[in-house]
């Protein structure tokens, strides 16, 4: 019985503080009552001098209990030794009880403070961003977001397996957190239901699941990806996310594994799409390895690209904005500027750079966000389209576009001499990895080949301590591409038109807006970019259609595969008729025209366009076929290369003009260090290979790419680049954590930002650099902009270099969206940065929404 009573008391005390306080109050009352009763009894039997009623004795007992000084007020003549002894016991009992209560309350408050600091309590933040896993990406990502949210309040919640106090200490040691930013940490795993309750998931703005670092807990990249995957699946299945299906972005190492978990969660995602509508943003994934490989590969095309990436997608200075027609503050501005092309807008705007248009039409069914970057110079801003631009802030965009109708200026033509980075590229890759699986290496090599813009990759040498025989057969190399341009294949050209599908008010009707017209096609004289092909008909049938409305004339078909069925209809009409009629809504006049095309002219155009496509395919195939014989793998003790590095080491490889240093194994050493010593080898290579000697008076045509592990190491090398001259035309430092953090930060604001980055790093568009050949050039940015716009490229910035007497260089300044009306003084070797397109064939082959007719 006693054990049961004792256990019941212990259980009650464990539950909360109130039970303990109630117990002490009850104990106090019982104690005073017992001692007062003893005093009263002793008074009655004559052992005590005073004689009081019991109530008086009890009241005096409580007075002695609550007031420790009351015992000194007792009259000595009326109390004997036993009076003082018993009454003194009441006072001592009171002191013990109150001391205990004070101790309990103090311990409770201390425990509560410790609980708050250690992240055991539920957070009450709302509209917050939750980050899962404290990886090496986190601090660079928080740095980016602190810059991004400089003008508004935002809360970040960090969930990791580390102690919250330690997490906050690491963050505060590196980042100066602005007053408008609140960061709190909690310990746990995303898949824990108790954790999901504590982080106020049902009121979160966004969830970002970072890939944890390879280490003691997660031994391999597979372990890391599975942790992200099970976190993703658990969060999507939680009751909290069901209440609040906020944006979710998950980082995987392997893209295939990411899509595997997304597909596994498809039932929940599809149901949410039905509930939330087509405008709801479904969960998205990124592959950190793909992103790194792609950026590194693009640096072989455009040296110093990493600097451009940092400036364009960072949050200091100008950045990318999507001017959305769904946003009320932009809708009227966009309507006023419909019909203007990129060239028109950039000629009239002095403070922003328009780099393209986009359409996000989710009527009737879910559709891709269509991004038209560096669109043809005659492709106009159309109804329901938004603008993609580079600007300092939203106020600048509104002010610029509002006043565009008042702008009128004449931009002079200039004729400077620039050189592109289209020299033959010969690459030496120094692989310091210790991995037994070569998949990382084959993926990187294929990424370099796939990203090559000029078809100028002539050789690739890989140096490594040891190779197994699996690479020598070169079966991992991509097959020569087949662009499927032959008859009855998807990219077979008929009219030489690239188009995308336009929705109409009716679900089963659509139009086909012309994006561009091949220069070989005679239709370029009759049609323009922006015109909408409503339908196609025979000459006889067309006569019966002239009185019909635009909607009635629009092509009717069930959704899915519309472009294929329309193309089949066109082919059939051409086969059966000597002429066909294109029913077109002109973009300028908005009038519907019936345009006749002769069969023989179609045949001539088709042959010319097809021939140009064959030449594109042939050039690409030739490069890849030649590479099979010019990719070599050589075993070399790279530790000796580093240890014995001297001024002459680099000259052994001077016949190659692109050096890449990387270590996949070090990428997996992801411990948080003040001094990441695993990067010392790469820093030594960076310094050693910077001793490349240039021929007298010759400007650099070599480039170097160094992959390092820690963002602290990156800061050191960036500081070197700023203060020391380099013999390289471009000197890229690739650091995975900064790359991924910028990508994630961009996606935090608008997922279209990540789609834009993907486009710029695909075989659809590319970022190019043009080196000034002239000794000097003075021109406004507007004049330079016009010069490149006429070449169908969009100028976004300038890299200004400082040169020494030996033609070595260091970056003096990178200007993205500089002041456009002021004169810019450029010297020989300075580089202008543009966004350019791959050819038409690559665009339709890579794009999900552009098709060829």
Report residues per predicted region.
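Cytosolic regulatory regions of ion transport systems
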Residues: 1-59, 63-546, 550, 557-559, ...
């Amino acid at each position: 019985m006693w054990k049961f009573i004792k256990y019941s008391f212990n259980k009650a005390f464990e539950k909360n503080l109130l039970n303990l306080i109630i117990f002490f109050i009850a104990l106090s009352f019982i104690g005073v009552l017992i001692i007062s009763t003893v005093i009263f009894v002793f008074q009655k039997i004559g052992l005590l001098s005073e004689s009081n009623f019991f109530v008086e004795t009890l009241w005096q007992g409580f007075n002695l209990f609550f007031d420790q000084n009351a015992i000194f007020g007792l009259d000595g003549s009326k109390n004997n030794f036993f009076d003082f002894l018993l009454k003194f016991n009441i006072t001592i009992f009171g002191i013990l009880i109150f001391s205990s209560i004070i101790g309990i309350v103090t311990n409770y408050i201390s425990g509560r403070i410790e609980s708050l600091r250690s992240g055991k309590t539920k957070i009450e933040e709302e509209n917050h961003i939750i980050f899962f896993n404290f990886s090496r990406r986190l601090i660079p990502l928080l740095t980016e977001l602190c810059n991004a949210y400089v003008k508004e309040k935002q809360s970040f919640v960090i969930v990791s397996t580390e102690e919250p106090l330690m997490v906050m200490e690491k963050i505060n040691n590196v980042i100066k957190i602005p007053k408008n930013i609140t960061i709190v940490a909690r310990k746990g795993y995303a898949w824990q239901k108790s954790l999901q309750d504590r982080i106020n998931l049902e009121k979160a703005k966004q969830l970002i699941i970072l890939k944890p670092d390879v280490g003691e807990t997660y031994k391999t990249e597979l372990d890391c990806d599975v942790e992200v995957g099970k976190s993703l699946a658990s969060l999507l299945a939680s009751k909290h996310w069901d209440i609040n299906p906020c944006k979710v972005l998950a980082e995987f190492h392997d893209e295939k594994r990411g899509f595997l978990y997304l597909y596994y969660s498809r039932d929940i995602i599809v149901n949410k799409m039905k509930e939330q509508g087509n405008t709801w943003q479904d969960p998205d994934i990124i592959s950190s390895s793909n992103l790194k490989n792609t950026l590194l590969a693009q640096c072989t095309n455009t040296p110093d690209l990493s600097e451009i990436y940092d400036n364009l997608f960072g949050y200091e200075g100008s950045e990318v904005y999507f001017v959305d027609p769904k946003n009320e503050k932009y809708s009227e501005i966009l309507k006023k500027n419909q019909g203007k092309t990129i060239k028109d807008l950039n000629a009239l705007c002095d403070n922003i750079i328009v780099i393209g248009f986009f359409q996000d039409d989710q009527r009737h069914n879910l559709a891709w966000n269509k991004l038209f970057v560096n669109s043809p110079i005659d492709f106009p801003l159309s109804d329901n389209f938004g603008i993609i631009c580079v600007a300092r802030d939203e106020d600048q965009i509104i002010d610029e576009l509002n006043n565009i109708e008042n702008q009128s200026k004449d931009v002079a033509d200039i004729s400077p001499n620039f050189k592109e980075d289209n020299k033959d590229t010969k690459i030496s890759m120094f692989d310091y990895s210790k991995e037994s699986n070569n998949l990382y290496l084959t993926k990187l090599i294929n990424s370099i080949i796939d990203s090559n813009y000029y078809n100028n990759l002539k050789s690739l040498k890989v140096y490594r301590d040891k190779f197994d025989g699996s690479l020598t057969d070169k079966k991992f190399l991509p097959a020569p591409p087949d662009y499927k341009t032959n008859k009855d294949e998807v990219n077979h050209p008929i009219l030489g038109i690239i188009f995308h599908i336009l929705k109409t008010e009716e679900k089963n009707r659509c139009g086909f807006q012309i994006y561009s017209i091949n220069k070989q096609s005679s239709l370029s004289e009759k049609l323009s970019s922006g015109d909408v092909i409503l339908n196609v008909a025979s000459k006889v049938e067309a006569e019966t259609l002239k009185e019909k409305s635009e909607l009635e004339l629009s092509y009717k078909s069930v959704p899915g595969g519309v472009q294929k069925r329309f193309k089949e209809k066109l082919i059939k009409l051409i086969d059966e008729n000597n002429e066909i009629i294109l029913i077109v809504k002109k973009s300028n006049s908005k009038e519907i025209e019936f345009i006749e095309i002769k069969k023989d002219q179609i045949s001539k155009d088709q042959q010319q366009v097809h021939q140009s496509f064959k030449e594109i395919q042939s050039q690409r195939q030739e490069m890849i076929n030649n590479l099979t014989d010019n990719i070599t793998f050589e075993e070399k003790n790279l530790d000796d290369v580093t240890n014995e590095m001297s001024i002459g080491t680099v000259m052994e490889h001077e016949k190659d003009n692109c050096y890449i240093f990387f270590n996949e194994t070090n990428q997996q050493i992801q411990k948080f260090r003040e001094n990441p010593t695993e990067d010392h080898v790469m820093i030594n290579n960076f310094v050693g290979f910077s001793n490349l000697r240039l021929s007298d008076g010759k400007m650099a045509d070599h480039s170097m790419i160094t992959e390092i592990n820690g963002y602290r190491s990156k800061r050191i090398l960036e500081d070197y680049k700023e203060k020391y001259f380099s013999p390289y035309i471009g000197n890229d430092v690739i650091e995975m954590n900064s790359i991924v953090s910028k990508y994630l930060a961009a996606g935090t604001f608008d997922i279209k930002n990540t789609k834009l980055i993907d486009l710029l790093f695909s075989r659809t568009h590319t970022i190019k650099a043009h080196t000034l050949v002239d000794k000097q050039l003075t021109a406004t940015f507007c004049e330079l902009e016009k010069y490149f716009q006429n070449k169908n490229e969009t100028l976004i910035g300038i890299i200004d270099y400082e040169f020494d007497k030996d033609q070595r260089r260091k970056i003096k300044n990178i200007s993205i969206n500089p002041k456009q009306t002021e004169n810019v003084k450029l010297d020989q070797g300075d580089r202008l940065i543009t966004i350019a397109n791959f050819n038409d064939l690559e665009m339709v082959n890579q794009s999900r929404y552009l098709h060829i007719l």
